């Protein structure tokens, strides 16, 4: 696992796609995947160095808020290796 995990949660798929696009374009991060939470909520996840993930989450959150609603965003620096078990298998 890389040094950080970044998450942006949006209301609707369009905002999630916009966030994912902005995140990977704005910083050197890898797209981990997305999760449909329910009630229209979608969470997009990226990995990379702490600084890159922070920049990506900021960019993704800003981009998603233009086309939709951002519910939450968070960066987990140095997540525990057990977190790997709950990430999408494509990671």
Curated annotation (Swiss-Prot):
Residues 4-88 form the BMC domain. It comes from the Bacteria. Pathway: Polyol metabolism; 1,2-propanediol degradation. Disruption phenotype: Cells lacking this gene are defective in aerobic degradation of propanediol. Most cells lack BMCs, 22% have highly elongated internal structures, 20% have amorphous polar bodies. Grows in an interrupted manner on 1,2-PD and vitamin B12; grows for a while then stops, then restarts as if a toxic compound was accumulating and then decreases. Grows faster under limiting vitamin B12 conditions, forms elongated BMCs. A double pduJ-pduK strain grows in an interrupted manner on 1,2-PD and vitamin B12; grows for a while then stops, then restarts as toxic propionaldehyde accumulates and then decreases. It is found in: Bacterial microcompartment. Its main location: other. The keyword Plastid does not apply. GO terms for cellular component: propanediol degradation polyhedral organelle. GO terms for biological process: propanediol catabolic process. SMART domains: BMC. SUPFAM superfamilies: CcmK-like. Gene3D superfamilies: 3.30.70.1710. Belongs to the bacterial microcompartments protein family. One of the major shell proteins of the bacterial microcompartment (BMC) dedicated to 1,2-propanediol (1,2-PD) degradation. The isolated BMC shell component protein ratio for J:A:B':B:K:T:U is approximately 15:10:7:6:1:1:2. At least one of PduA or PduJ is required for BMC assembly; it must be encoded as the first gene in the pdu operon. Required for structural integrity of BMCs and to mitigate propionaldehyde toxicity, probably joins facets responsible for BMC closure. Edge residues (particularly Lys-25) are important for function and assembly of the BMC. The 1,2-propanediol (1,2-PD) degradation bacterial microcompartment (BMC) concentrates low levels of 1,2-PD catabolic enzymes, concentrates volatile reaction intermediates thus enhancing pathway flux and keeps the level of toxic, mutagenic propionaldehyde low. This is Bacterial microcompartment shell protein PduJ. It comes from Salmonella typhimurium (strain LT2 / SGSC1412 / ATCC 700720). The lineage of its organism: Bacteria, Pseudomonadati, Pseudomonadota, Gammaproteobacteria, Enterobacterales. The gene is pduJ.
């Amino acid at each position: 696992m890389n040094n950080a995990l970044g998450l942006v949660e949006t209301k609707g798929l369009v905002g999630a796609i916009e966030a994912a696009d902005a995140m990977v374009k704005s910083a050197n991060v890898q797209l981990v995947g997305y999760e449909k939470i329910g009630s229209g909520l979608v969470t997009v996840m990226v990995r990379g160095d702490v600084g890159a993930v922070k920049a990506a989450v900021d960019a993704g959150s800003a981009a998603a808020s233009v086309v939709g609603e951002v519910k939450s965003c968070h960066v987990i620096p140095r997540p525990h290796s057990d977190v790997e078990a709950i990430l999408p298998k494509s990671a």
